[in-house]
């Protein structure tokens, strides 16, 4: 399969769907999404859809990754926290735009797989942490931007607290079936919140989001 042509077609689709930040488009043109999906899903790697990656998790559709990264309004010197590393794909995209990416994954198997892949692909400005991403990473805070790649019933307090002055936080917030993508921006002592669009994500599991006790039964 000609992944290079498939990737170019994906970028063309992102432009058609309204992605305008050239840095985001260039980053996604550089990162081999097919490397981040299971071998049996690789023929769909550059289609605009979420794909299973194991452990009940998915790699987000390319448009959603582009939309969320664009919404962060990143600068080259930014330090970014991603909550929900998953396959490591979004962290790889972020790493092509900013100085440093910290990404947290609560599922050890996914985290270990992401570490191996990130190292194999030569991304040197990404650190993968295993743990509860809803706690953030206080030892590395504050962050210029925080991207949450799973849905929470609310904005976790530790993430709000770890946002730098003028920092941006993009997160899906809502119930089990549907959420709203929010962007929060720190302005002095306040956080200004914008509603971006309706979305549907896998649940964010952790002490400050969904837990086994809190998460609604099927």
From Swiss-Prot:
Record PROSITE patterns: PCMT
Reactions this protein catalyses: [protein]-L-isoaspartate + S-adenosyl-L-methionine = [protein]-L-isoaspartate alpha-methyl ester + S-adenosyl-L-homocysteine
GO molecular function: protein-L-isoaspartate (D-aspartate) O-methyltransferase activity
Record GO cellular component, one term: cytoplasm
Name of this protein: Protein-L-isoaspartate O-methyltransferase
Pfam families referenced in this protein's UniProt entry, alphabetically: PCMT (PF01135)
Domain of life: Bacteria
């Amino acid at each position: 399969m000609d992944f290079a042509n498939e990737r170019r077609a994906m970028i063309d689709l992102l432009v058609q769907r309204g992605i305008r930040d050239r840095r985001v488009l260039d980053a996604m043109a550089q990162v081999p999404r097919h490397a981040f999906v299971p071998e049996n899903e690789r023929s769909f790697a550059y289609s605009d859809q979420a794909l299973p990656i194991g452990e009940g998790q998915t790699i987000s559709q390319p448009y959603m990754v582009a939309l969320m990264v664009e919404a962060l309004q990143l600068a080259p010197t930014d330090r970014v926290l991603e909550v929900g590393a998953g396959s490591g794909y979004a962290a790889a995209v972020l790493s092509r735009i900013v100085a440093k990416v910290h990404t947290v994954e609560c599922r050890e198997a996914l985290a270990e797989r992401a570490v191996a892949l990130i190292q194999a692909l030569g991304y040197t400005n990404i650190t993968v942490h295993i743990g509860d991403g809803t706690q953030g990473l206080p030892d590395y805070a504050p962050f210029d931007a925080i991207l949450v790649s799973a849905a929470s019933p609310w904005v976790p307090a530790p993430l709000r607290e770890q946002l730098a002055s003028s920092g941006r936080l993009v997160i899906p917030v809502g119930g089990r079936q549907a959420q709203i993508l929010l962007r929060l921006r720190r302005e002095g002592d306040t956080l200004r919140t914008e509603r971006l669009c309706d979305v549907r994500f896998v649940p964010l599991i952790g002490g400050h989001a969904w837990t086994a006790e809190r998460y609604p039964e099927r």
